[in-house]
Amino acid sequence: MSFKKHLKKFSAVICAVAICMAFTACGSKGSGDKVYKVGMEPTFPPFDTTNEKGDLDGFDVDLMKAIAKDQGFKVEFKSLEFEGLITGLKSGNIDIVASGMWASDERKKEVDFSNTYYESGLVVAVNANDNKIKSIDDLDKNSKVAAQIGTSSAELIQKMQKEGKIKEAKIYNKVNDAVQDLQNGSVSALINDKPVTKEYMNKQKGKIKIVGDPLNKENLGIGVQKGNKELLDKINKGLANLKKSGEFDKLLKKWNLN
């Protein structure tokens, strides 16, 4: 075979490979989007909950789906204990924390947070039949106070117990268990985020109530691993675009957060 024939045959093979690669690239578009694992604790409505099918649901789920769509990536949701969210993020078990988490200075030492997506605050809730406790100042050395593990409210009541201001700080893995004990009188009060407490009030009509003013202000953020600027930028850009388009406000309204 002549050199020219060899050259023609070689060129044909190269062209065929190039065409194949082009078709493969086109065919994989969309199916090859980056997938990020999002961790959340599902007893924190309306931010994080489960629907009637048992699937993770809530404002944070809808928000992350909308950000992912806007920024061209995909998300998978994982249910974790609240206390394990930051640990899971640092270990690489999850890529994102979207669970109504306060971007506190202490947490910022371990996590990079997005721009604020919601301003919340802690409130005191009591049994609806309790007319003695009207604010946090009415909690005393006979009071058993509940909070969820790993939260700012847990830190607060543990400090109150240490200082002798309350009898016992009862820490729960899940908020709904704390609400149940509040209803049956096992604890005197529950300290928790206002939107979440209001959601449980609506579900348990006439059984619990909020007393006094909010105790603080907490800016909620979406967390990523320290130094993951690429992912953080995507989340912040997505948030900004959703707010600009009006989609963010629609989600707030859907979950009664407006």
Where are these regions (language model features)?
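Extracytoplasmic small-molecule ligand-binding "clamshell" domains
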Residues: G32-G100
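C-terminal motif of bacterial Sec signal peptides marking the signal peptidase cleavage site
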Residues: M21-A25
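Acidic, polar ligand-binding/catalytic clefts
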Residues: K65, K74-D138, I208, P214
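Ligand-binding clefts/hinges and TM-proximal coupling segments of bilobed small-molecule sensing domains
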Residues: S28-G30, E76, S152-K170, K209-V211, ...
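Periplasmic-binding protein-like
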Residues: P42, E119-V126, K198, N202-K237, ...
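Short helices/loops that flank or line small-molecule/ion binding pockets
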Residues: K69, E83-I96, E110-D112, D137-D138, ...
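A ligand-binding cleft/hinge motif common to bilobed small-molecule-binding domains
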Residues: M101-K109, L156-M160, D181-N184, S188-K217
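Extended ligand-binding regions for polar small-molecule ligands
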Residues: V61-D70, D130, D137, I149-T151, ...
